[in-house]
Every structure is written in C-alpha cells, then in structure tokens.
Amino acid sequence: KYLAFLDNDHSGQTRRLIDVITAGEANDGAKLLEYAKSPDPSTRYWAAVWLGVNKTADGKATLLKLTADPVPAIRVAAAQALYRLGDPSKLKLLVEHINDPNLLVGMFALRAIEELGDAGKVHRAKIAAAQKSKYEFSRRIARRLTTKWR
C-alpha cells in the first residue's frame, strides 16, 4: 500500500485528482464516468463520490460495477452514491464493510449508513456492535445511531 511513495513524481496523480474533483464541482457527468474507469483507486473513489453527490442518473450502471471494485473504500462510496440515486439495494454492502480491516473503511461505511437516515435501522445489532471498534470515530457514529434508534 505504500508503493506510491516509491515514485517521487506524483504530479500526474495530483493533476488527475484535481481534475476529477473539478469535474464533480462542475457536475460534468461524462468526465466523472470516464474517471470512474481509471486504474488509479483514488480517482475511482472521487468519481464515485461525485456521481452520488451530483445524483448523476447516467452513473447508475457504473456505480453498480464499482460496488464490486477490489478497493473497499470505492465499494462503500459507490453504495452510498447509489443510495443517493434512490437505489437502496447496496445497504447490506455498507453493513458488511463496518468491520473492514481498514478502520477508515469501517468508519466510512458507518458514516454512509448514518447519512441514509433510518434505512440502516434494520441492521441495528451490527451497527451497535461497532461501538466496540478500535477506531474512536466508528465508535462515536455507532453510538449516535444506536442511541437514535432505541
């Protein structure tokens, strides 16, 4: 996971990330769909995030593909984006990522569930268990949700 640091010149990746975020801010769905195919995980992640933020209806098929991405954070971002597009079918995917070995992914999943309102309530037990997470922010989110859903 640290191989990126072996390359001294990150200007290409930096430029690409600026471009994908700028495309998101401009609501340029066509560019975001192209960036979602990038070999760079950071670029795919931000494309998925912005497709959801902008509720890009043309992005649904791409987001469905991204829910099977090899990178867990991208799967979470895609599932959250689909929910924003009115597709709740990947809620279970978010719940499955709560206990991801990468603690940030678990926190991202919990935060996405929190943003969905009461939809995650059916998974209350698994969310409540996250109050014992090693990551403080995951514990906080799980505690907020558990308290809210009593």
Specify the residue positions occupied by each region the protein language model found.
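Amphipathic alpha-helical scaffolding segments comprising HEAT/armadillo-like alpha-solenoid repeats
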Residues: 1-6, 25-37, 56-68, 87-99, ...
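Short inter-helical turns and helix N-cap capping residues of alpha-solenoid HEAT/ARM repeat scaffolds
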Residues: 10-11, 39-40, 70-71, 101-102, ...
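Boundary/linker elements of alpha-helical solenoid repeat scaffolds
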Residues: 11-20, 47-48, 78-79, 110
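Alpha-helical adaptor scaffolds
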Residues: 41, 45-53, 61-64, 72-88, ...
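Residue-level detector of extended alpha-helical repeat arrays and alpha-solenoid scaffolds
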Residues: 14-15, 44, 75, 106, ...
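N-terminal segments that cap or nucleate solenoid repeat domains
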Residues: 20-46, 50
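Eukaryotic acidic, Ser/Thr-rich intrinsically disordered low-complexity regions
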Residues: 128-150
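Alpha-solenoid repeat junctions
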Residues: 21-25, 51, 55, 82, ...
